[in-house]
Structure formats: C-alpha cells, structure tokens
Amino acid sequence: MTIKLHHLRPAPGAKSDKIRVGRGEGGKRGKTAGRGTKGTKARKNVPAAFEGGQMPLHMRLPKLKGFTNPFRTEYQVVNVGDIARLFPEGGQVTVEDLVAKGAVRKNQLVKVLGDGDLTVAVQVTVDKFTGSAKEKIAAAGGTATEL
C-alpha cells in the first residue's frame, strides 16, 4: 500500500497532554507544583543569565575601550591595478565611470590606492589619492586630480 498524507498518524506515545500543575492539593502536582518548598527556585522565576551567585559572564568580560570618532570620513577604495583592468584603453576616469563599471557605490567618497600596475595614460578625477597612486598614474603619463 502506498503512503498517503491522510494516512499518516503520530507514533504511539508521541503525543501527550501537557501537565497542569498547581491545581488542587489532592493530586500529585498540587500545592508546590513540583518545585519543592521555599527558596528562590520555588518563587516565580530565576533570571536566564543567573549563574548561581558566581560572577556572571557579562561582568567577567572587559568593557570596550576607546571611542568612535563621529567625524571620521570613510572612502570607497579602488586600486591603480583595478583602474588599469577596468579601463584598458585609458582616457578620462571619474567617480561616475567607476560607479558605472561597478567598482564603487554611488554617492560615496572615492580614494585611489597604489596597489597594482598601470601602463596606459589615464586622467583620474576622484576625491582622494595616496602618494604611491599619484606616482604610478604620473609615471604612466596620466594625471591625478582631486575633487
């Protein structure tokens, strides 16, 4: 016989009613409801992070040091090697061109770093350059202009 969804049944003993505790004193789990007598564990609940009195983990760990500079400027970075790969024919390279090629996100500041080699002359116009990037662009016959 093939198994069908409407023939499926839970295994015997798999389903049992939940035990309702603290309902009258005559039954097995009345009065103290299986919690024993008195003490913290008998009263309401114990915090999930409570470790029995030892120094809790969140107090054993060190506090974070330092601060976050609210005036920090973050740049999208592009290497000279990436420019050489994306623009093999050279020419003008602006932030919009880099966004169009998928090298950086739009509406973000762009910085060119000096990793990689450049063989064609490119006129790069972005927000910032490193010293090595300027040198490599100039050595290839191009210009590096900051916005």
UniProtKB/Swiss-Prot annotation:
Residues 15-28 have a biased composition (Basic and acidic residues). It holds the Pfam family Ribosomal_L27A. One of its GO terms (cellular component) is cytosolic large ribosomal subunit. InterPro entries: Ribosomal_uL15 (IPR030878), Ribosomal_uL15/eL18 (IPR021131), Ribosomal_uL15/eL18_sf (IPR036227), Ribosomal_uL15_bac-type (IPR005749), Ribosomal_uL15_CS (IPR001196). Keywords: Ribonucleoprotein, Ribosomal protein, RNA-binding, rRNA-binding. GO terms for molecular function: rRNA binding; structural constituent of ribosome. Transmembrane segments: none annotated. Residues 1-45 are annotated as: Disordered. GO terms for biological process: translation. The keyword Signal does not apply. Belongs to the universal ribosomal protein uL15 family. Binds to the 23S rRNA. Part of the 50S ribosomal subunit. This is Large ribosomal subunit protein uL15. It comes from Rhodococcus jostii (strain RHA1). The gene is rplO.
